[in-house]
Amino acid sequence: MNKLLKSLIYDGKKVLSESGVKNAIHEARLIVKKTLKKTELEFITSQDKKISSKQSNSIIRNFIERTKGKPVSKIFGLKEFFSNEFIVNKNVLDPRPETELLVELTIKNFFKIRDKKISLLELGVG
């Protein structure tokens, strides 16, 4: 049976929320968008379009994976970091959001200190 895209998002939000996924609506939207390989614009403008049974089943499988605790990045094998997508799998740690902040601050301050001798210490890396 073909469902509307927005219905799948609602169903996904409900299932994810009931399984304890934080920010379930965001994750449901992300899973649907990534499963269908849509750009943000395509995703936004296709909310009232019907999705094929095959696509719907793929989305549902990905929702189920997420309810089992599998991160979205591991479901799709990709993680965005600093505006780039990196391939990830079960053997790779996902970059943390605060790491992006550290990179941004380093780049921002690099030109202020580039002629000075500095020491860096990186703690807690795998």
Model regions: which residues?
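N-terminal auxiliary segments of SAM/dcSAM-dependent transferases
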Residues: 1-76
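SAM-dependent Rossmann-like transferase core, predominantly class I methyltransferases
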Residues: 47, 57-126
